[in-house]
Amino acid sequence: MTELPRIHPDDYCDEDLPRLAQPWWQTLPGNFHALPDHFLADNDTRWRIDYTASIDPLARTGLASMAGAAALPASLNISRQREERALVDFYRPFLQEEDPNTFFSRPTQTANIERIPVAPYHFQPEDGDAHTLRFRSPFEPKNPALRDRYLGHRRNRTAWAQHWRHHGEPRPTLIMIHGFVADPYWLNTRWLALPWFYKQGFDVLLYTLPFHGRRKGRFAPFSGAEFFSQGMALLNETFAHAIHDLRLFMDYLREQGTPAMGATGISLGGYTTGLLAALEDDLAFAIPNVPLVSIMDLMQSWFPINLQVSLLKKVYGTDLQGLREITALHSPLTWPCKVPQAGRMIIGGAGDRFAPPKHSHLLHQHWGNCDLHWFPGNH
């Protein structure tokens, strides 16, 4: 018997939310982060939503404190502030291009990918094998002024992934992109029930984002600390690097004969999945899971990092619209989705207070009102 979802897509009350209009960074209201998220639900589902929503703020505050503390020294550096204003100007012309691949260039070199058997505590398929993949990334920043600084992160220049592969003929591959700080393969394996997808016949690739896991700097305080803490210009390059290395892994999968590939990701990984869906012509599906879509609006809803938004306005000499524009280059809202309509799906948590439902709602509009699944839980 098929179990019906507890929350129907139409149960989200969006009467007070804006209709998406481009350029979104100018048309989105300044109080978007504070607009309510309401659902029609029966008493049991309402209790589940409210209970899970009450849990998120505590964890969110802890994560925001960590991220804010990591970013604060760079924000307070006066000489770095003047340099940052000049650096972000380099990226403005790319926003005017029709093709996002003008900035997110396809790799021009191949990768020599090494396969290493995974440790025994990782998932071990009975009818296949599991390997760690790695290669020396040939990525170079688009902005020459950032080349030395970015490439100075030597550990970040090795790309990592874990690959589960069935014996016999190549299978369709599910690409999984983790969230901010949530990079451990074992965590995503269990939390996202990835062995279930493997047992349905998918090969699985778990991709490690830049500055996470073994790509983390030796002295970084936590995994992912350097992802957002080095200024908005370098953040653009970080997303370019994330896409570049993932594309090299995808090229490898094509060479191995995989008949199809699709991507899913959670939170920051959902954001990256949305970006990838605007760049790749042959993704069979894209399923962002509790995605964010505007980094600056998300920051405004996270205490205490929301206190740094006014500092960022001062650093970059702009307002909220200007900060959104600086980060729009990598937002899924900026570019048309290339995945066929039938292959698009968004998963949102009704009680999510990390990436609130309004973010999923915006992406749902942008993706032509594609399939949308709400679950009565949090991030």
Task: Describe these PLM feature segments.
Residues H153-A159, R165-L174, K199, V339:
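Proline/glycine-enriched tight loop/beta-turn segments at coil->beta junctions
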Residues M1-A145:
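N-terminal targeting or regulatory segments adjacent to alpha/beta-hydrolase or S9 domains
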Residues R353-H359:
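Conserved alpha/beta-hydrolase "acid-adjacent" motif
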Residues T272-D319, W374:
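Hydrolase active-site cap/lid region
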